[in-house]
């Protein structure tokens, strides 16, 4: 059975497990500050074509989404996302818990259009009482979407252009990014995503025992 929920529900590649075994007894500084993390950061920057990019390591998609959105937005701002988007439907109020509202946009097969962002922003600022409303502060998309659909390079560039026009940071959820990048129908590369977005993340495969595993 093929399982496409996200990129981190599979076990680790045997070569990764072997390397973990080989380095297990090394004494290193805290996670994120050791030589292996430094090496990983450089490899990620090279793959993205962004030599000056900041790279951080977090655990789990929901935590990452909440951390990024909570860090980018001002207290009076919300995040624009598809009405079918992951942060809109499937994160159990994690974004709202940070004090920010998810401002939903109409979606077509899970995707939002640049025109929808323009319409929302223009309508918002055209309302004389907008000072009493939640301001649009950033845009969230995922690739693939909740429906498994992919943004084309043209669509991504159009969304990026609108976001720059209105000074809205563009955030791409990468929980399923690996599937999107290797799809035979995709024309978007990792470098395209790095160029068009302000922040995105890449999920890495890992193995983590569940409580049930520990009890057996």
Report each predicted region and the residues it spans.
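Single conserved hydrophobic/aromatic residue that forms the stacking wall/gate
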Residues: 206-216
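Conserved N-terminal alpha-helix of the aminotransferase class I/II PLP-enzyme fold
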Residues: 13-61, 83-88, 94
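Conserved PLP-anchoring active-site segment centered on the Schiff-base-forming lysine
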Residues: 71-89, 118
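Catalytic PLP-binding core of fold-type I/II PLP enzymes
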Residues: 151-183
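Conserved active-site segment immediately N-terminal to the catalytic lysine
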Residues: 186-204
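PLP-dependent aminotransferase-class I/II
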Residues: 99-146, 151-158
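Conserved core of the PLP fold type I
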Residues: 52-73, 103-110
């Amino acid at each position: 059975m093929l399982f496409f929920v996200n990129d981190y529900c599979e076990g680790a590649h045997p070569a990764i497990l072997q390397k973990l075994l080989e380095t297990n007894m090394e004494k290193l500084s805290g996670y994120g500050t050791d030589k292996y993390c430094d090496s990983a950061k450089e490899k990620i920057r090279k793959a993205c074509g962004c030599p000056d990019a900041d790279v951080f390591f977090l655990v789990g998609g929901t935590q990452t989404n909440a951390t990024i959105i909570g860090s980018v937005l001002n207290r009076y701002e919300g995040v624009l996302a598809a009405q079918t988007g992951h942060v809109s439907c499937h994160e159990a109020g994690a974004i709202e818990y940070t004090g920010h509202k998810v401002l939903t946009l109409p979606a077509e097969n899970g995707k939002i259009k640049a025109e929808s962002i323009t319409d929302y922003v223009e309508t918002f600022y055209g309302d004389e009482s907008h000072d009493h409303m939640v301001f649009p502060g950033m845009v969230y998309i995922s690739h693939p979407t909740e429906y498994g659909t992919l943004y084309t390079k043209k669509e991504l560039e159009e969304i990026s252009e609108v976001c720059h026009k209105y000074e809205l940071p563009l955030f791409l959820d990468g929980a399923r990014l690996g599937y999107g990048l290797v799809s035979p129908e995709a024309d978007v590369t990792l470098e395209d995503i790095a160029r068009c977005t302000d922040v995105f993340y890449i999920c890495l495969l890992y193995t983590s025992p569940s409580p049930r595993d520990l009890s057996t």
